[in-house]
Amino acid sequence: MSISNLPILPPDPSNAVGDRERAAAFGQRLFFDPGFSLTRKVSCASCHDPLRAFTDGRALAQGVGHTNRNTMSLIGASYNPWYYWDGRKDSQWSQALSPLEAPGEHGGNRLMYVTRLAGVPAYRRAYRSLFGKMPDAIKYGKLAAPKVAVGHPA
């Protein structure tokens, strides 16, 4: 399958690395890496399979848990002004965070992903070459920590 016949995208001033081949290669590695899910068993390609037109062929998507929506194809997604069936996201970068943090999809949090990214030397080098120094996981840890329910005292 090829998507090379799509028209060239208009410039995106919010994406400083959008035209860099190294950024695309790094993104492709992350897309297929199941290490970026809570269970380390679900990659973006688990639901957006290139051999299934970047969908999963299921009525309802399944990641680390269950979801209540069908997986949208990624073909042509860069041309959309809105993302998700209900249009709740208006940019690809903001949309991309949602499945990573959704309990039924990838099920993680930003601190977990920074830690995992930093733990793979090739990823650490790729990140640094594109964006500079990685975020300090300790400094931002409290902001990225998952919210947990707290019971009432007895």
Q: What spans do the regions from the language model cover?
A:
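Periplasmic c-type cytochrome electron-transfer domains
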Residues: M1-A154
